[in-house]
């Protein structure tokens, strides 16, 4: 975007010597200006919601993290094991298509949807809200689950679907506490977890 290119130009003007572009197009303005490039090679994006590009960005950042981790002497074994499982997890999602279709009908006549995430799940909640808006024209907002009681909780009732990305780590207990508040207000909860 123009904002990204403008930021890179400003960094170059300020004499930042190490610039890295993570990009899908090898001959873009961004890649020409940047000192280093990490190409995603995802191919052209057809979808309005840009699902392939987003997924490729996540995967590329994961690979970059593994490379940097190795350079600092840390083991990237756990990350590599996780990367190897991605294909199988995607296949499992295809097998869940009937369940996903059934769940999707619960959003059909809704005017608003709330998405929650915490830690690494928060940006996923933001992206999921954006995808719902772009594809279905249903208003959606995403919040860090810890911010739920600072406004969004007041909107929750039996008509409000609340989608939560529940991390499988030390943050789960805190997120479950937030979901208890949603359920106390009869909000419809949909939980995605690993």
What are these model-predicted stretches?
Residues 1-194:
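A SIS-like phosphosugar-recognition module
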């Amino acid at each position: 975007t123009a904002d990204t290119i403008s930021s890179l130009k400003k960094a170059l003007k300020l004499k930042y010597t190490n610039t890295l572009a993570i990009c899908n197009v090898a001959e873009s303005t961004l890649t020409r200006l940047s000192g280093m490039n990490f190409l995603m090679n995802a191919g052209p994006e057809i979808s309005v919601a840009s699902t392939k590009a987003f997924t490729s960005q996540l995967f590329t950042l994961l690979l970059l993290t593994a490379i940097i981790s190795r350079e600092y002497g840390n083991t990237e074994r756990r990350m590599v094991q996780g990367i190897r499982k991605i294909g199988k997890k995607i296949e499992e999602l295809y097998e869940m298509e009937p369940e996903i279709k059934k769940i999707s009908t619960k959003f059909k006549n809704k005017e608003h949807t709330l998405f929650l995430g915490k830690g690494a799940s928060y940006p996923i909640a933001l992206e999921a809200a954006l995808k719902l808006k772009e594809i279905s024209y249903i208003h959606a907002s995403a919040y860090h689950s810890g911010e739920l009681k600072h406004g969004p909780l007041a909107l929750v009732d039996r008509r409000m679907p609340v989608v939560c990305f529940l991390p499988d780590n030390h943050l789960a207990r805190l997120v479950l506490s937030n979901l208890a508040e949603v359920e106390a207000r009869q909000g419809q909860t949909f939980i995605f977890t690993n």
